Structures are given as structure tokens and as C-alpha cells.
Amino acid sequence: MASAAVANYEEEIVRPVADFSPSLWGDQFLSFSIDNQIAEKYAQEIEALKEQTRSMLLATARKLADTLNLIDTIERLGIAYHFEKEIDEILDQIYNQNSTFDDLCTSALQFRLLRQHGFNISPQIFSKFQDENGKFKESLASDVLGLLNLYEASHVRTHTDNILEDALAFSTVHLESAAPYMNSPLREQVTHALEQCLHKGVPRVETRFFISSIYEKEESKNDMLLRFAKLDFNLLQMLHKQELAEVSRWWKDLNFVTTLPYARDRVVECYFWALGVYFEPQYSQARVMLVKTISMISIVDDTFDAYGTVKELEAYTDAIQRWDINEIDRLPDYMKISYKAILDLYKDYEKELSSAGRSHIVCHAIERMKEVVRNYNVESTWFIEGYKPPVSEYLSNALATTTYYYLATTSYLGMKSVAEQDFEWLSKNPKILEASVIICRVIDDTATYEVEKSRGQIATGIECCMRDYGVSTKEAMDKFQKMAETAWKDLNEGLLRPTPISAEFLTPILNLARIVEVTYIHNLDGYTHPEKVLKPHIIDLLVESIQI
């Protein structure tokens, strides 16, 4: 921690400043333009490959197990967004046929795919793989692919899927002991899955890994599908790099790195988060709006967390609630910079959406931002006054400061088919949204505990839990882990049909939970310190294209 003396009003204020590392990326993403000739060439070939793949998907002279494997491969290769309607119709048919399989591998794959697409298939299909004592048969220990599919299936479980608790424990133990003796690329796939299960992974990260590290090395691979996936990944990457260049220029023009040096400079990492919410080309506008929002709220977070005084933060909170540029004169100079930038950003959003007659929806995101800032202010007051809230009071405030209610709402702004009732549904904090927010809160709190403790924070989630329950740090962290597991079950339940809104609008909520799982893996704060966790992912998704 460093100290900074700043002349403010007529007195000198000594501020505790979190010593954040500079951006890892410099200006490397500033200038990128798509090579239209290459993009056009890729797009033409993709169209032809798309038709071949569609024909393959719709072919009827094939075993059901092979159809499930084909869908799984297409999804893992990241090209399923081209065939959403076809895949949904096939899975709907399979679900309504009540098909069952004798082998664990296909049964588990069927279960996971159907659940991930919202079909509430019964976990009783696994009872045939248990002995008379209700334990999974030890003879399954040699079925590595079956175990891997069982392991992946166990992560889509809900509260009533007790059999899948046993499935997770059983498959994990056997996969861990067998992994060192497996051949490549199965060994890499199992090792990766044990560290990062598919259901909780960021889709683009999982796609890149599967294409380059697994599918390309499989003897049974389909060369046409592999080529399609590589071309599609690289073409999308061009679009993503173009978006990042646009956002990087916007960020550079704001010049926060110079004018607000106390804050984290993480616009590239913010883009990774937006890309994690949706990667498909039709969400380009939505992604750019979301990354700008994440970057801006990160500045606000650091203002509350690492710089502002009580008096300043109260004035800032009040100004945000009033949402009026005339309030700017009440703020110290450094706060004027971010306040004006925030109001300008939302004016830009309104202007951008007005051509489609949708500018009125921006108010939903503004109200959520006001909520975040109010709760940030409560947190900073607790810190300054040394208040130690009970864990229930802490959580009622801290769920909003994850920013996930706000980001979920913002993620809808650029989604062209969103309607007013979707925002109304979201504003009521439905259980699936609450689950995603809880996952973010408890995982973030666990990963950042030591750093916040070193800054003198006593109102952290882990500290509150330790005091309330009279438990050790490890026991408190275990409690938080249990909360995350419960929330994942709620989230998985919320994806099952019938759903109150279109699955298209549930996916960003699911993906926000996935991003936090990946960013804070192994209890590391990958956002504040991206070099270990996010840097390799950013290189894979935004720097290096796939060799074709």
C-alpha cells in the first residue's frame, strides 16, 4: 500500500492508495483493422462448411448415440450458434422419446446436453449404474470416457439430484487416479476438466482449448468440422479485435491512466469479461456497451475502495443519485472527471439506441448503477467507522456491490430482441440472477480476503462469517464454498423449462457466473492481478489466431 498526499479544498488529505500494477498490454490493441479480403475468403468457405454441417446434423441414418456425440463436438468446437434451431429440435425429439442407453458414456452425455438446453431429464437414468447399496459400481472405474462424461454431467445438478453428488465424488476419485496413465489427448482433456469443468467454463476459452489441444489430436476427428471451427474462430477473433481496438481508443481518449492514477487500468481484462458474456457476432454492439460499462464501474469501485474520503464519497453518491451534470460543481476535481465520463457514456448509449427506438431502456441500467453506488458508499462508511456487520447485513449490501445486478441489466441493452418485460423480470431479482450474484460475491470474497485484510478491511464477508459463527478462516471459506455450490444448483434450476423469459436472456446470467469462476480460479484475483490467470486466456482469444 502506498500513500498519496493530495491538495483538496483547503486542507491536505493523506489517502491510502491501493498500489495496483499497470496494464500488461500497453497500446498493443489500439490499432487493428480487419483484412477484408481474408475475412471475405473465410466467410465464403464458412458458408459452404455450414451447409455441409447442417446436412450432417439433420441426417437420419445414424445411431442416437452418434447424434449426441456430434452435437457435443459441434458445441465444444464453438460453432453451435450457427445451428441453434436444429440442435434444439433434435434434443426436443430425444427428450420426448425418453431414450435410454446401456452405457454410462452416452447416458451421461445425454443427461448433460438435455439439461444444458433446459430439458428436465430425470437423474434416475443413472440408477442402473449403481449397485444394491446405491453406490456406483466399481466396474465403471475402467470406463474413462464414461467417467469423464459422468463428471461433466454432475455439474449441471440441481437440489433434487442427490445421485449426482455421488456421481461427482465417484468420477473425481477415479479420474484423478487414472489421469497419469492415460494417452494423449484424453489425458489433457481429463486433467483440464478436473481443474475446470465444462459447464462452469467460459465458452470461448473452452472452445480454444478443445480445438487446439484436444480435437486436432484426436484420431477420429472430422477434418471438415475442424476446419470449419478454426475458420470460424479466426473470423470471429477479427471482429473481437476490432471491437477491442475501438474500446481501447475510447479508453485512451478518456485518459484515466493519467488523470485517475489510483485506479486499475484493466480495459483489456474488461473486454475479456464482456466476451465471456457473449461472443457471437450479433452481440457486437452489446459487447462494446458492456465492456465500457465494466471499465467505468471499475473506476468507481476503486474511487470508493482505494481513494475517496467520507465527505467526497457522500457527495459523489448524492451526485450519482441525482444524475445531473449541474451537480458536478459540488465534487472535487478528480471526481468531476469520472462523473462527467459516466453521464456522457449513458448519453451515448441513448443516442446509439435511439435509431432503433430503444433509448428508453437505458434508464434500467442507470437505476442499477445508482444502486451499486449507494451500496459502495455503505461499504466505505463501514470501513471508515470500523463497523462490523453481521453476515446477513453484510450480504444484503454486498450482493449489489458485486455489480452483477447492474452488469446483467446492462448486458441486455445491446441485445436487439430484448423487450420491456425482460427488464421488468430482471428488476425483481429472480432466483437465477440472485444465484449468479451470490456465486460472484462468495468467490470474489474468498479470493480477495487476504489482500483486503492487509488493507485493514474488517467488514469483509469472510471476517463477518468468522465472527458470526465463531469459526476459523478456513471454515468460513468452506461455508462460502458451500454457498456457491447451492447457488449453482439454483442457477441450473433456473435454466430448466418452462422459463419465464427466452433462454437467450438467461445465457448472459449463466455466463457471468462462469466468468467469475474462471477469473478467481485457485483463489487468485485474476482481475486485479491478470498476469497468472487472465493473461494466457487473453493471448489465446485476442492475440494469437489458430493455425489453419
Curated annotation (Swiss-Prot):
- Tissue expression as described in the entry: Expressed in roots, but not in shoots.
Question: Which residues hold Mg(2+) 1?
Answer: 301, 305
Q: According to its record, what are the GO cellular component terms?
A: cytoplasm
Catalyzed reactions: (2E,6E)-farnesyl diphosphate = (+)-5-epi-aristolochene + diphosphate
Amino-acid positions noted as binding Mg(2+) 2 in the UniProt annotation, renumbered to this chain: 301, 305
Drop me one GO molecular function for this one.
magnesium ion binding
Gene Ontology BP annotations: defense response; diterpenoid biosynthetic process
The answer, when asked if Lyase is one of the entry's keywords, is yes
Pathway listed for it? Answer: Secondary metabolite biosynthesis; terpenoid biosynthesis
This entry's comment on the bound cofactor is: Binds 3 Mg(2+) ions per subunit.
Question: Record's domain comment?
Answer: The Asp-Asp-Xaa-Xaa-Asp/Glu (DDXXD/E) motif is important for the catalytic activity, presumably through binding to Mg(2+).
Under what name is this protein listed? Answer: 5-epi-aristolochene synthase 2
Which organism was this protein described from?
Answer: Nicotiana attenuata (Coyote tobacco)
